[in-house]
Amino acid sequence: MARLIPNVEIDRIYPISEQKVARALVEQLPQDCVIYHSYPWLHSNTHSGNPPQKTLYEGEIDFVILWPEHGLLVLEVKGGKIDYREEERDWYSTNQQGETNRIKDPFAQASKNIYAIKKLLEKKQYSSQNIPFTYGYAVCFSGSRYRGGVPPGSEPSIILDMNHLPKIKSSLQSIFNHWNHASSQRSITPADRKKVDQILLPEFKLIPVLSSQIEDQEADLVRMSEDQLHILDMVKSNSRMAIE
């Protein structure tokens, strides 16, 4: 059974489309796998100018799958009835109430998200070398069955649907093989696993500085003195008051 981060009950995951995928991943993948759900990212790009300008970009990834034996995979999930309209090159989702809304291209989202993870890994650890393990992305339509041709920017080998959920382990193994550009599978070594864990889930600490602690203590003393003066005033005005 894989480990889910954050450590929440799967029944509390929303939307249901992601809950189904989370359950399949946690129950079927091995114990050394880590599944990051709703992983947020933020990175900056520098644009030319005088002076150069930095712009922040943000996003959220449905699932980041860290499987040491095979690599790292970003998984974008779409639920409900999904349609791609070729003449418009747009994607649409229809909910249970029959309401249809245009949505973002899931393959473009997944591609953008793996690029963000790649940039994060390169910035923190792998700036002077290629990332030494397999990484890629896939899209899962957890409430639909896939049929027909594939839209531009996609590939059958990185598409999952509801039929893949009962066998998601073997399906993901196949996807990793398609993203592997080396002659043999590039797994994540224990050393790299430690680095990736520290990058994706860094330890965040706030340590009070001494001057701040002194200021807090002085403020407490002032409050105590004010309280004591207030009590003395009350005692003076009420001779029958007792203080324990």
Model-derived segments and their meaning:
Residues 1-223, 229, 234:
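Intrinsically disordered, low-complexity Ser/Thr/Pro/Gly-rich regulatory segments
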Residues 228-229, 243:
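Glycine-rich phosphate-binding P-loop
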Residues 237-244:
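Walker A/P-loop
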